[in-house]
Amino acid sequence: MSVPTVLEKILVRKAEEIAARRAIVSLAELEQQVASVDAPRGFANALITQARLKLPAVIAEVKKASPSKGVIRENFLPGEIARSYQAGGATCLSVLTDVDFFQGSDAYLQEARAACNLPVIRKDFMIDPYQVVEARALGADCILLIVSALEDGQMAELADVAKRVGLDVLVEVHDGDELERALKTLDTPLVGVNNRNLHTFEVSLETTLELLPRIPRDRLVITESGILNRADVELMEINDVYSFLVGEAFMRAEHPGAELLRLFFPERKLAASGPSID
């Protein structure tokens, strides 16, 4: 397993972060917290239901910064962004919680989820069962497993813990080898194809199109990164891909929900959502 240099740094730091968190809140304490959180909102089911109708099933990302781009959005108010996304027709939310590399926060996930009715994925680098239980304790409905960051045994263990605490799993792949490992190891219906090459950071929608024939029809393909305009959306829909994870294109827009609407639902008007940045 070849781990890109940036990812390697992130994983080293992540292990240190988990050790520090565990010293403050034990796994047993997290398990107790899980018992009192709201029931999961059904992340996978929401996406599958929408995509079966051949309508865009959009996972809209709440993302302040990234290692490659720095700060993406200065005016970063997770609750308002979440309401804006819901008004714009998002099916689910993705919230970055990694602190050191993405300027994320657990609080951002909680704020975003409390501000809307949408299911939420905790977008982080999951390497330890502790983080999975922690995700559910925070109120997340789904976790991300990045194949390039994990051995097969780790993936299976994390997915088992997720199932036990009621979380859906979105597995992310970047190439054919990772796809093969994911399909062999996990039975999650959600397969995300990241169009960004983690070694070069180049983005190509061809990544999704090339892997598509190798993904069983009973899995939902989610194309991630590189969806910037209507032509990109239409290219995917022509190829029967109706689920999208989009972050930067929305975060750079003055009104994220309005940009979502323009990109995916140009025939609709923005739904009323109460006070929001739209």
From Swiss-Prot:
The protein's name in its UniProt record: Indole-3-glycerol phosphate synthase
PANTHER family: INDOLE-3-GLYCEROL-PHOSPHATE SYNTHASE, TRYPTOPHAN BIOSYNTHESIS PROTEIN
EC number: 4.1.1.48
Coiled coil: none
Top-tier EC class: lyase
One Pfam family here: IGPS
Domain of life the protein comes from: Bacteria
PROSITE patterns hit by this protein: IGPS
Pathway: Amino-acid biosynthesis; L-tryptophan biosynthesis; L-tryptophan from chorismate: step 4/5
UniProt entry keywords in alphabetical sequence: Amino-acid biosynthesis, Aromatic amino acid biosynthesis, Decarboxylase, Lyase, Tryptophan biosynthesis
Catalytic reaction equation(s): 1-(2-carboxyphenylamino)-1-deoxy-D-ribulose 5-phosphate + H(+) = (1S,2R)-1-C-(indol-3-yl)glycerol 3-phosphate + CO2 + H2O
